[in-house]
Amino acid sequence: VDCGQVNSSLASCIPFLTGGVASPSASCCAGVQNLKTLAPTSADRRAACECIKAAAARFPTIKQDAASSLPKKCGVDINIPISKTTNCQAIN
């Protein structure tokens, strides 16, 4: 998994993640779906998680509740927590 792909998948989610808008855009949700496609294995999900953590650290205004609700709001069942504090190595 390449962090550039992960970052570009989630870039359109920044307005939602920082609380600028109340719900994620269609392009944001398409990115979440794409992220699921990019990470089919446990190792891929752990790598994607590390990318997400690194990206989240660059955006101190990301709201944790928005981040954790993103997959559900998009209707995507993804096994990668979107958080600044996830222990990525614990992901299966």
Curated annotation (Swiss-Prot):
PANTHER family: NON-SPECIFIC LIPID-TRANSFER PROTEIN 2-RELATED (PTHR33076)
UniProt family annotation: Belongs to the plant LTP family.
GO molecular function, one term: lipid binding
One family name in Pfam for this protein: Tryp_alpha_amyl
Superkingdom assignment: Eukaryota
Disulfide pattern: C3-C51, C13-C28, C29-C74, C49-C88
Keywords tagged on the record: Disulfide bond, Lipid-binding, Transport
Protein name: Non-specific lipid-transfer protein A
Organism: Ricinus communis
